[in-house]
Amino acid sequence: HMVRRFLSQKKHENITFNFHQLHTRTLIEGLKQEQFDVVFCSYMENEPDIRFIPIINQDMVIITPPGHPLTEKSSVVLADLEEYPLIGYDRTSGLGKYCKGIYSSHGISPKVTCECPDEHAISALVAEDFGIALVADVEDIHEQNVKILPVSDVHLVHTVYLAHMKDQFMIPAVKNFIQFIRKEGTHL
């Protein structure tokens, strides 16, 4: 939506974007190799040459198939994830590493039966009763036949960042886009 708002301005109508859906590590390497001007990604530590601008906070929620036993509970806690097969994010992705850190810091060991690249794939498998999942609350999960349950014992938030090289030449269109996102695109 942010890109659409940017392009809807008359002064930006001749700017084009190329979109790629890749893991954070691959996107960061692409920035370093000048394949990309900017990327939307998770935060990565130990990247001193990259500026990470937080732009969106996404609540993390548990999704289940309709009629799942968790939908009958008055509240769902993070430890409930241990009781059922879990569909997870790809372990090498930003969200995969984030979720693994959540599980570790809360002392739980879910039974991950399958890993997927994104919420669309995860929610499709959950809808088909392959398991439950902890996911970012994004539009894709609302389009599937799943129940969306808030985690009641801890508030979990994943932040999406706009990232770019700190000391690299940028054409005016890229500078304008970054400035636009900083001014109008952040939803924290």
Regions found by a protein language model. Give the residues of each.
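Central regulatory/effector-binding core of bacterial HTH transcription factors
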Residues: H1-P48, E115-C116
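Short hydrophobic/charged patches on amphipathic alpha-helices used for structural packing
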Residues: I28, K32, F52, L78, ...
